[in-house]
């Protein structure tokens, strides 16, 4: 029976196998036939259709019924086929945002699954649920590398699931499942779902050898290093730590997981072994300069193969230079660096890590490489010049550098023929670390520079004072115990310009026989060592006989004026009391005479007079002298500085490169020599820094005898002059009371009023006037007037007339409510008269005047800002005068004071009197806003617009909207927002850019322009003056600012209200001439960049373009044509020329006194890269510190977001200050641009051990705790989420969050980043995050090693990127210029400037094309 049963089963099995084989055979045959047929049909094509992604059903995904089937934060999503899939946040890839739906402006999305996932699986895409991104389950095993924290398993884990029913567990061990005795081991039980609310802490345990239950030592619900629970990490693992593993720990380990709310019970088992290791002994390392030999012995018989890994310890991380496995003794390691520390890691080769130890050694030293040249520059401290030399350690120091030697040697550039020794300037007194070596070996012990005295491997020394007319070459050596390096001859030099002689001898006076003149003899002309002398001026100071020379100012400080003004001023009694005396230029010569006579009006024969005025303003006036006075004076020597210093060839053995030096600015000079063109001296004096003047002391005073007392002049002085003075005093007192009571006189005596007005006009015309200034002289004129705290500007401004014309309409009490200020009245002759309403005689008044621009090219209406009572009148004026453009140069409120009533609506249609105003559009920019309105007059809109009833019903928008479209007008309002009352803008760039935009509008050129500030006189008058003077400059190549402002004041009183505004007119025009319009449209930027990159000899510009409006030259082309010619023969590109324009500056550099204080010196990494006092970040006071307000950081005004440019911390103390700044400024975004390998541990302000660690800065009383919450590594940057708590600030909530973006694509030895694209991506990410912080006004902190170089590039590109997004315009030059004015050492290299252009051009090319 049993046999039959076996036979029956065997038969069934054979039949089944036969059937299966047959089916496989026929199926294979059919497939082969089909394949052959397809091959014939597709002979020319070999394309294979890819596998179709599998659906959820094909993958066997369980269908969920509700969210109860899903893990914590999971959601059950049903597809079109009704199949439900659990989705959860944990299954999302790293690129998916954690949160979503917060930004109402740009709703954030959850992106897509990665490409690999979508190519294999056709499952629902990520979506937003409860403000969290949820994703479909994973299906591929997850590989965890040995370096991936916190697990470091070097193994695979289960794919993440979202359905509770998919619960599974896997057992793993670290570092291995087979280890040596004594090793610390961690066993893991890792599940594939989120355990929150599903798996309890005690529901997972380990069972050893099937009998011993061992509880986990750590679980996902426990905090890690004080942070939040780890349940939200990517993997959920229970851990069993086994310290000092023994053989008794060997065996099988089963992980068992039981779900608390269901009957799910899953397990996984692994085998774990503890064994005894083999060892090696007597391992030795024998190093030389370039290699090392490693030998060892093995225990227990045959040679044992080991693994060796050699790490060079030149930084905190180290670099692996040798790594091989399964090596036997001996081993030779070659190509090592001399005098370099190394660490040899020795380990077993059987994978069980039976042993692991290290061996440290250092290779032998040899002579170092030369030091690396960093930079050389000339610095101007205000009192003297110094040469700053910067260098870095050699590329291969080959040992410990014990000394550096620096030689700064200055040779004459232009010799006067005498044998002058080279100058060896000493190190500046404030820096005791440095010394200038003269090359004498006997002094090398004393003149070496010890590198220990410097904080890092960047060295900087200053040498001075420098002598004029010198070329200082720089050479640096490095020395270690093996010897001294070859010299590093720097390619850059410190070149000093010409200067005045060190001493000018005092002239000797001689009295002439006629007692009405006197002579001067000159013992010896000054030497030309400091530069060729171009002119000699003889200055004379007349004084009353009883005035002593002791009260005179120094000869170089006395005010110079005309002959008549000097005598008038110096003879006043008040001049002696106030010690205020003037001097005048009597004679001038190209060559110094041996003797000359003053007062005879005759110049020394055969000697030419100077063709250049003193200070470009004062000519010689050798007029007859007055007798009875005392005369003194001095000799002035003028030396013209060279504007350019041409390059010299180094390779031919000539002088080393000479680099251009601008004394007014600490920048790297450019190598130049004096041009050989026969340029006259006076043309060379228009260089912005001006010529140098040397002054002698006052010569001994000489007294001219008085005339007879019976002479007519004596009678005049004794009798008539006192009477005239009394008459002038009485007239002044009378006019004072007349002015005080002017309103009474104008009411009761109209005739007297007219006479008074006429007299005032005629009297003001008698004041001193100032002529037109050529365009080329505008910068020089500004510099000259700006000296001595704007003395000449103040004198010119005080000469402006104050017209007192009739203001009857403004003075009426019925119109008092329509005036914002009592002293700002509208002249009757030029006031705007509105149409009267219902016969009301006072309804035609508004405080506004017609203003004619230069030669009446435009018509302005200068108005006060509307008050609440005049908003309707304001719009009525716009309608009646047919104005289509309003220019507003004030803010609604300034310093908590209303400057202007808000006269426009933002959203709803609004009625102002008889004018309907409908908002059409608006846009906001950094310095201005543009609004458009459609307005209509009620009387011209037809009877159906306004319904019967009161005005309140008019607000019914549906009734009004669309009724007056045919009768409406489009009005533009350009609102400049960066100008405070009674002041001038800090920088002219924003206003000029705003004005360029206006000058391109037809509404600005062809219709009346309504312009207002608050009073309608100060900022309004300044704006009109600049615009009109631009027209005059373009038409006549000159500007008569004084005359035009006088004409303005004839049309409206007090136009240009302050000296500061008057000075700004000059400054704006001067900078317009110096820099031109560098603002480009985005669409033209690439072509503009290509033109700049071309050599000037290959490009030319045509200026034949005509304006389509009035036939004149268009403003854009005219502005370009006003600058110097764009076609030169020097071979430089336009970009290089534009970069050199950055060196031009009308003002002196700002001070950095606070950074130079003794207590702050150690807080600066580089002495030249410190914040200006005006823009430095001021820290709040700290208890226990006398002065703790300083940090090397500067405020930078941004476009939408402000910035702080800071240097990297230099110590733990400055790292604490860095966090104090972050807390005080409420910073949430930090950008780090320096290479982390350059940082020492004491400089880092974040935990260096990565995610989950913390660090502490400060003292017990004042401290900050910083925690690294997470760390994400990307291709070119690292994102760290940091959390900090300030101990001394109880008002600040704990655990404030800061995101740090650490850019890794910028090598420390590179001037610019490796990739413009990677930096642009980082900028976009930073700005996108900053814009997502709703309502945050906190600045973005950007820091690098010196706080200027890399930070300047990042901020510059950020500003340019934001502006091209908002305005579609780019201005690299002015953006860089603005940054340089906020912090020193920004954009000192041409490569940095060129990189900004290239980065924007590449971005625009990819974005707009």
Curated annotation (Swiss-Prot):
It is found in: Cell membrane; Synapse. It comes from the Eukaryota. Tyrosine-protein phosphatase 1 domain has enzymatic activity which is required for the negative regulation of egl-15. Tyrosine-protein phosphatase 1 domain is required for correct PVD dendrite formation. The second tyrosine-protein phosphatase domain has no phosphatase activity and appears to be dispensable for clr-1 function. Isoform c lacks both tyrosine-protein phosphatase domains and is likely to have no catalytic activity. The extracellular domain is required for the formation of synapses between the AVA interneurons and the PHB sensory neurons. It comes from Caenorhabditis elegans. Keywords: Cell membrane, Disulfide bond, Hydrolase, Immunoglobulin domain, Membrane, Neurogenesis, Protein phosphatase, Signal, Synapse, Transmembrane, Transmembrane helix. Residues 32-53 are annotated as: Disordered. Residues 1-22 form the signal peptide. It holds the Pfam family Y_phosphatase. Possesses an intrinsic protein tyrosine phosphatase (PTPase) activity. Regulates egl-15 activity which is required for hypodermis-mediated fluid homeostasis and protein degradation in muscle. During the formation of neuromuscular junctions at the larval stage, negatively regulates membrane protrusion from body wall muscles. Plays a role in nicotinic acetylcholine receptor (nAChR)-mediated sensitivity to nicotine. Regulates synaptic levels of nAchR subunit lev-1 in the nerve cord. Promotes the outgrowth of the quaternary dendritic branches of the PVD sensory neurons. Residues 159-267 form the Ig-like C2-type domain. The gene is clr-1. GO terms for molecular function: protein tyrosine phosphatase activity; transmembrane receptor protein tyrosine phosphatase activity. Residues 276-366, 372-502 form the Fibronectin type-III domain. The keyword Repeat does not apply. Disulfide bonds join 189-255. Residues 793-1072, 1135-1403 form the Tyrosine-protein phosphatase domain. This is Receptor-type tyrosine-protein phosphatase. The chain crosses the membrane at residues 713-733.
